[in-house]
Structures are given as structure tokens and as C-alpha cells.
Amino acid sequence: MAVHRAVLALLASCALAACSTSGPPADSTGHAVVPREGVAYYAQSVAGHLALMRAARPLEDWLADPAAPPALKERLAQVQRMRRFAVDELHLPDNASYTRYADLKRRAVVWNVVATPEFSLQLKTWCFVVVGCVGYRGYFDEAEAHALAERLRAQGLDAVAYPVPAYSTLGWTNWLGGDPVLSTFIGYPEGEVARLLFHELAHQVLYVADDTEFNESFATAVERLGGERWLAQASPAARADYAAFDERRRAFRALTLSVRKNLERIYAQALDEHALSAIENENALRASKHAVMADFRQRYAELKAGWGGHSGYDAWVARANNASFAVQAAYDAQVPAFMALFEREGRDWPRFYDAVREWAALPKAERTAVVQALLPSPSDE
């Protein structure tokens, strides 16, 4: 899921607001460079999140509103049950988050911008107060996100702006009413709404500064495990609806994973080809990359032909580049390790969370090594 979170901070040091504060990046000399758009970026973060909070009303108010559509009421009542399930069955935080609903009247809550070098899947990072450095930058205004992506492309980077249906403030806004349920995802299949809520609540269990892959993989593991448990007690119709949705997603994920591995292979191989001149190497890389992407789009067309007209991934495929595959990796690269840890802890949620907290307390290099040790070897995949 690309679920990816754009305004990660409603910080104690930033009164009232989602002040996702862009830490100064380093220039080639290692010195800090303060972005010219810094103040404007803070302002849009504050204004955007406060507008979202103002739009949110308690679920009970929506359920009592005679003008609210019956289908919406039914889903919001279901969300209340999901929220209780998250606490009782998954031991996720019991707080104000997802007890209110906001109709944003737009297709995304924020738009994230991600970027990589032309021949790498290493995400460019931006740094924020408290939450550390992350591989994306979020905007409430779609045009601003696309403008940043265009500036990054002008610098020679692969960059993309994409819509995000939800984000987490990590529990820091519970005193303001918490993160609300949003119109941007309320219409998803039942199982997917449950997974999204579980994912975002998992970020409130723990969050490690400067380790996007660890944070997102942990939350993705919780969403998958929790989603399975929710669907096990859901109606047959809900399971069937979700099964069709998830089958397409699994097939698409398998396709994009193979493309990601192909890109990683050609970029790694290029580092060893010292005999080629820089220009020859660059031209060869560009040709190889183009071939991989052309093959990807052809294979996607073949996959889509069996989906009965479903076109939900068309926009992703149309804009796909290194950055698209890199951000996808951040959400699932370490998931198998967390799944293995859950089994090791006897599928006991409190024990699992305690074990993850122990990992989180380690220095990053040591933490990564511990996680890698639980990942399957390539021959096992």
C-alpha cells in the first residue's frame, strides 16, 4: 500500500501544527543548505493539517445525521468495530485516532514526492524535526508536489509525485481528536480499510527516526497479519470482495518485485564495469534501463488483460521510474523478517511488539543486521 505518510509531525515544538520541518540537506561539501521554500513548506503543512482536523466530525455525529448516505453510515459503523478489534485482538493503541470522519472532497489527503538518481534505487531523503530523515516529501497541494517533482527531474533525478490516501501523526494529535478516517479511503474493500487502519495504528506503537524501511515494513507486517485475522471473522461477501482485490495486488507486486530486482542487477553490474568509459557505461545503462521498463509495461498489459477491465494500476505504471520502485521497496523489503519474528514470538502480539521495540533500540547498522538475519535467502524465495 502505498501508504505511504506525508506530514509526520504535529510536534510539541511546533505549537498546534503538522510542522513537518525540512531539515537542511547537505551540499557536496557536507554543509547544511537551507531550502528557499522552507517557510512556505511549513505553512502549507500547518494549514493543510488544520483544515483536515476542522473537517473531521465524530463518527457518532455522522451516524446520527439523517442526511448522511446509508452506505457511508454502514461503513463508519464497521470502522468502529475495526477500531475495537484493533485494540482487543491486535493490542494496538486505544486512543482518539480514527474515531472521527472527514469528507475531503478530493482523491488524496496529500501528495508525496520521491526521487532517486537516474541509475539507482536509493531514495533521496529529507529531514524533519523529531522523526528524522525520510525518503519522501509531502504536500497538501497537488500542484506544489508536481512542481517539486519537476524541479528534481530538471536536476537529473528520477522523481514522481503520487497520491496518498492516509498518513499518521504517530499519536501526537490525539489531544486534538486524533487522526481521522478519511473519504480518500473509506470506499476501499472492507479488508483493505481494516488493513489501512491497522497499518497507521502500528506507527503509533513505535517509530524509529531515520529508518523508513524498518518503520514501514513493521507497519505493513501488522496490517497483513491483522487484516487476515479481521477477514477470518468477516462475512463471506467481504472475503470474496477482498480476495479479488488482493489477487490483483499480489500479482502486480510480484511483477514489480521482479522489475526491481532487474534494475538493481543492472545498476550493480555497472559499478563493476570499470573498463568502460563513463559515457559508454552511462549509455549502456540507459539502454538497459529503457529495455527493463519497456518489458515491464508489456508484462503489465498482459497481466491486466486477465482482470476484466480493471485499470487501478494504470496511473502507477504510466509514471513508474526508479523512484516508484524504490519507495515500494521501503514498504515491503523487511516484511518477511517481521512475519518470522511474529511466529518466533508464538503469534503473541504484546511479545511481538516488545521484540520489535528491542530491535528499534539498537543502533541502525546493528538493527539492520538483525533484521537481515531473519530474511529468507534468495534461494528460499
What are these regions (language model features)?
Residues 53-70, 124-134, 319-320, 336:
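Acidic/histidine-rich, surface-exposed loop or edge segments in extracytoplasmic proteins
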Residues 20-24:
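Bacterial signal peptide processing site
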Residues 15-18:
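C-terminal motif of bacterial Sec signal peptides marking the signal peptidase cleavage site
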Residues 81-249, 264:
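Acidic/His-rich structured neighborhood in mature extracellular/periplasmic domains
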Residues 25-58:
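Post-signal peptide N-terminal segment of mature Sec-exported envelope proteins
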Residues 45-86:
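Amphipathic alpha-helical packing elements
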Residues 1-8:
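Bacterial N-terminal signal peptides that target proteins for export
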Residues 257-381:
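Pan-zinc metallopeptidase signature
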